[in-house]
């Protein structure tokens, strides 16, 4: 018997809801939210677009263009949130400080936030931003799942070795509460694993397909 993951259908129905420059502009703090975070150019927008089978999140050759909290509705009570990208050198310092202030406010106050999916470029994992996010997740007991993106840029063996190395580093520094996988948007590698995490956090059960 086949099993259908209900999150797939919801993600395919994802629609842009609103953009917020600060927490006060966010949707009502109810239901379920999963936030997507990542350093600039880590493939965050591409991952979101792959999971939703759409071009919801803006991709750009200039990293760091996401300047707002962007909310996408899956249904009446479930949302995906595209958080501002960080770390791009050409973004003015005052703007970076503005992003950080409101990102911290969102992460620290949002009751409906069920987990954070953190994108790391598999070729350059565990940046200072990544470690900051891991520290926050540990301190707040927030579930975190890591996508090692752009896995198609490495050979299968090199990707596996990086996965094992990052897993070991995270286990030593942040415990067993963080899960991690390889991901490639163009190859759709790891998509099903990511869907399972989303379904679990959003409390959706797999349904048998008759």
UniProtKB/Swiss-Prot annotation:
GO biological process, one term: division septum assembly
Key words of the record: Cell cycle, Cell division, GTP-binding, Magnesium, Metal-binding, Nucleotide-binding, Septation
Name of the protein described by the UniProt record: Probable GTP-binding protein EngB
Binding annotation for Mg(2+): 45, 66
Annotated GTP binding sites: 38-45, 64-68, 82-85, 149-152, 182-185
Alphabetical list of InterPro entries matching this protein: G_ENGB_dom, GTP-bd, GTP-bd_ribosome_bio_YsxC, P-loop_NTPase
Record family assignment: Belongs to the TRAFAC class TrmE-Era-EngA-EngB-Septin-like GTPase superfamily. EngB GTPase family.
Any Gene Ontology CC annotation: cytosol
Entry-linked NCBIfam families: GTPase_YsxC (TIGR03598)
The keyword Cell division is annotated on this UniProt entry: yes
GO MF term set: GTP binding; metal ion binding
CDD domains: YihA_EngB
Nucleotide-binding listed as a keyword: yes
Cofactor: Mg(2+)
Sequence ranges assigned to domain EngB-type G in this UniProt record: 30-204
Record function comment: Necessary for normal cell division and for the maintenance of normal septation.
């Amino acid at each position: 018997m086949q099993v259908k993951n209900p999150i797939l259908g919801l993600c395919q129905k994802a629609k842009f809801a609103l953009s917020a420059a600060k927490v006060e502009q966010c949707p009502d703090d109810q239901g379920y939210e999963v936030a997507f975070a990542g350093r600039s150019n880590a493939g965050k927008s591409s991952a979101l677009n792959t999971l939703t089978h759409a071009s919801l999140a803006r991709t750009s050759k200039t990293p760091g263009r996401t300047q707002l909290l962007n909310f996408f509705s899956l249904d009446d009570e479930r949302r995906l949130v595209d958080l501002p990208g960080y770390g791009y050198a050409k973004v003015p310092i005052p703007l970076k400080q503005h992003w950080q202030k409101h990102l911290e406010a969102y992460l620290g106050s949002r009751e409906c936030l069920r987990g954070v999916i953190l994108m790391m470029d598999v070729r350059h994992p565990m940046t200072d931003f990544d470690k900051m996010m891991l520290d926050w997740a540990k301190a707040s007991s927030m579930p975190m799942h890591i996508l090692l993106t752009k896995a198609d840029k490495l050979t299968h063996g090199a990707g596996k070795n990086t996965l094992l190395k990052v897993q070991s580093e995270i286990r030593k520094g942040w415990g067993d509460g963080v899960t991690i996988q390889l991901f490639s948007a163009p190859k759709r590698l790891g998509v099903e694993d990511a869907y399972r995490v989303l379904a679990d956090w959003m409390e959706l059960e797999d349904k048998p397909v008759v």
